[in-house]
């Protein structure tokens, strides 16, 4: 007579099956993670950091000629500020409009690509660490002490323009940069917002005015 199969065999096979680990899911974050492709859309004028940047963006210094030292002269960048980026051979040149640049550390609102006002979030979530803050390097027209603004200052006429034939004014020019924002409905996402990036001269012919 053949022996009956043991009833413990199914239990033994159950313990021999490979176990599948169950990973705990992290709680959903209220802010979206910073995806890798977004880094390609970030402007040099935007920095995500836990502390305010110590100096201007490198690209800004290169465009301004801060690293073009005269031949044979020792480099002395310790005293070079944002307003002193012109090469030594061009010290006699004057800008049509005076501009001042610096990091904006307390931006709260901005206008997006659709012309709507959005809230600029103060913190950006970072994996495995404390959140980052958003800093914007903006360039604006330099204010003048005079009430109406002097030549080259914001709100004043452009330097070197013949006032007999032209009406000129120095105005801030804006560009779009990527930033983490929230709209009026509370929807959080990366949007294009406008920030001041230059001070330009606008002209209006006096002969064409009424």
UniProtKB/Swiss-Prot annotation:
User: One Pfam annotation, family name?
Assistant: NGF
The tissues in which it is expressed are: Highest levels in prostate, lower levels in thymus, placenta, and skeletal muscle. Expressed in embryonic and adult tissues.
| Cysteine disulfide links | 97-170, 141-199, 158-201
Q: Name one GO biological process term.
A: negative regulation of neuron apoptotic process
Q: Which residues are glycosylated?
A: 76
**PROSITE patterns, alphabetically?**
NGF_1, NGF_2
What Gene Ontology molecular-function terms does this entry list?
growth factor activity; nerve growth factor receptor binding
This protein's name: Neurotrophin-4
Q: Where does this protein come from, organism-wise?
A: Homo sapiens
